[in-house]
Amino acid sequence: MKIRSRFEEMQSELVPVSMSETEHIASISSDATTEKTSELRDDSCISVSGDESSRLETGAELLSLDSDRILCQTNEHCSQIEVQESHIPDCGSGENSCANTDTCPEDSGQIDDFPGGDFTEQVSKTKEPEQTVTQILAELKSSAPAEAANPKTASASLYDTDCTRKLISEMKTVSASDDLLGEIESELLSAEFAEGHQVPNGLNKGEQALALFEKCVHSRYLQQELTVKQLIKENKNHQELILNICSEKDSLREELRKRTETEKQHMNTIKQLELRIEELNKEIKASKDQLVAQDVTAKNAIQQIHKEMAQRMDQANKKCEEARQEKEAMVMKYVRGEKEALDLRKEKETLERKLRDASKELEKNTNKIKQLSQEKGRLQQLYESKEGETTRLIREIEKLKEEMNSQVIKVKWAQNKLKAEMDSHKETKDKLKETTTKLTQAKEEAEQIRQNCQDMIKTYQESEEIKSNELDAKLRVTKGELEKQMQEKSDQLEMHHAKIKELEDLKRTFKEGMDELRTLRTKAKCLEDERLRTEDELSKYREIINRQKSEIQNLLDKVKITDQLHEQLQSGKQEIEHLKEEMESLNSLINDLQKDIEGSRKRESELLLFTEKLTSKNAQLQSESSALQSQVDNLSCTESQLQSQCQQMGQANRNLESKLLKEEELRKEEVQTLQAELSAAQTEVKALSTQVEELKDELVTQRRKHASNVKDLSKQLQQARRKLEQTENGNHDKDISSMGSRSSSSGSLNARISAEDRSPENTSSSVAVDNFPEVDKAMLIERIVRLQKAHARKNEKIEFMEDHIKQLVEEIRKKTKIIQSYVLREESGTLSSEASDFNKVHLSRRGGIMASLYTSHPADSGLTLELSLEINRKLQAVLEDTLLKNITLKENLQTLGTEIERLIKHQHELEQRTKKA
């Protein structure tokens, strides 16, 4: 009781001292820094108090160990150490950081003798750091107003200077707007340069000048773009340098802050330790006086501790007996659980046997199912193969029918052609007879005219000389008439020769027609033989189909049987699933019981571990006390090292700050110059972009005018051509249609050429405009409107091109039909002559691309697939043109024949009139 009263007196003496220390530290921190730094330092004070409490704990433990040596090392002292350890952390963690000194008097009250030599050494050690502490405080007071004076260095922002902040904000704002403008400009350029250059009234006078002007503008624009890009790159490099400098500056500041905080913490700890040492010296002096009185009280306390220990031992024995009873109960539970586990194992074994039987049955069923499925697959394959054969046979039958029909049609067509040619041959014979009669009549008339002329000449010679002049005039007239008649006779002779040539041609065609008739008759005989064969094959195939139908019915019956077996299998599977569910429920019960058994075992192991932990904790507490003593010695050494390092770092920080300020000023000047250059370049770019847009608009308008003029002129030309064709050829609708097709094809070629001419303009217009710093809503709206108009124009062009493509496709189809009909009419052998065969042989000997066409192997190494395809296309185009020319020539020949007949009739009528006259 006396010891406790003494402890309370010591606590009342120590509390005001600790409060005064905290007030003194708070006053220093408030005078040195701003509000933000004061909050940080208050936190540091709290942390210091925590460190001090740990160090005081170590001091208290040292004192307690000394008292153990003095006293008789009883169990009472160990219990007091445990009480002290439980009290000390609570004092250190509270708001009053210095309240941890309350535990110290208890330790001092138990000390009997303190060695004098150790104490003097400790006092001398504490006097040495007192001088250094005062110096460090003075330096901190001088550095605090300097930090408050320059708020730029104390700022917590990433970018300290106003210039860097402005630059980064401009960079962030410019990037989004520049991206948007770049996208719109690229779309505008691709849309506006798509249309061709159009000049008003269809005249292309200033195209070269405009092209040169566009090239100049484009080159100037590219140069300015390059300069702008270089400036942007330099600006980015400068910004990166500024950011690196700022980051280095911030890192140095953070290091400075941390070091200043650590220095302040060390100063506070040093002050507290000095005060604590003084208090301990006072307490040691008082404790020496009180040691004699404490011997008596200690003996009484030892007796009380013995009594308490006996009571605790009784309580521990009771707890041990209770634990033994619980252990016996747990053993009984364990035995019961094992019995239940054995019963469950037996049940499990029976269920496993049932499961094995069921699995065996399942395997048998699965094997049966596999066999049935294999049979089913085999039958399905047979069925599918038979179906494929039947479909193939049906297709072959249909093909044969189609071939038969086509051959019948060809025979009929050949017969009709023969009849028509025979009729035409008869007509030509009649015409020949008529022409021969006409020729004889013309010869007789000519002889009569000659005789008349001779008579007239004789009469004129016998007449009088007075009428000689008149007769000369009449002679001249008659000579002119004779010359006219002679010309008419020569024309008639030429007509006669032409008719003879036509007769020879008709004879040749008649011979060719007869040859074709013979070949067609032989083909008809062959086709009849093939028809008989196909009928026999059809009968055979029908028999095969009937057999396959019977086989398919058998297979269907087997499939039904397999389906029934499959249903039985599914029912067996369902039963097996029910059994599996029952097995799972039983397994879950077994697992629950096993978990209960494991839980009981774990409880036993936990009780054993608890007893082991109690013994190990006592050993740990003794080892920790010795470790704390060594830590106190190490901390005193590290304090001196840290103070020297703090001084060195302070000097290095000052040098770095001066260098930073110089570099910041240089960078500011460079950034200002770059900004001025950038603004000038941006103004130039804006002016050029406006000029380019105006030129584009002018080009678009001129191209539109040019296109409209060209369309008008093409329409007028077409109308004039139509009028000319109508005047020259009255009834030539087919010629007009062919000319229209050619004009449409030529129009398509022109459209392609114009598209190819415009494509480089589109590619050149796809040069994207670089970033602009500002966005005008009016400009954006105008550009959107222009884009919409361009989109509408493109849609119109697409519709026109689709219509044009449809027309071209229809024309191609018509031409293919004409070509097919022409090829079907005439065989390839009749078209080629002997001269063409000789030419082919000559070409094949010479070698080259044409030689590879007429030989089986390629004669030229340069002949590739692409080249051969191009040659094929060109030849096809030539073939189409020649076919069209041949068709037109035939039609022209027919018209010429009709005109010749008309002229002959007209001549006969004139001759009859002259005879009548």
Curated annotation (Swiss-Prot):
Keywords: Coiled coil, Phosphoprotein. Residues 737-748 have a biased composition (Low complexity). InterPro entries: CCDC186. Residues 1-52, 97-118, 701-769 are annotated as: Disordered. Disulfide bonds: none annotated. GO terms for biological process: glucose homeostasis; insulin secretion involved in cellular response to glucose stimulus; response to bacterium; vesicle cytoskeletal trafficking. Residues 33-44, 722-736 have a biased composition (Basic and acidic residues). Residues 220-736, 778-822, 874-913 form a coiled coil. GO terms for cellular component: Golgi apparatus. The modification Phosphoserine is found at residue 759. Expressed in postnatal germ cells. This is Coiled-coil domain-containing protein 186. It comes from Mus musculus (Mouse). The gene is Ccdc186.
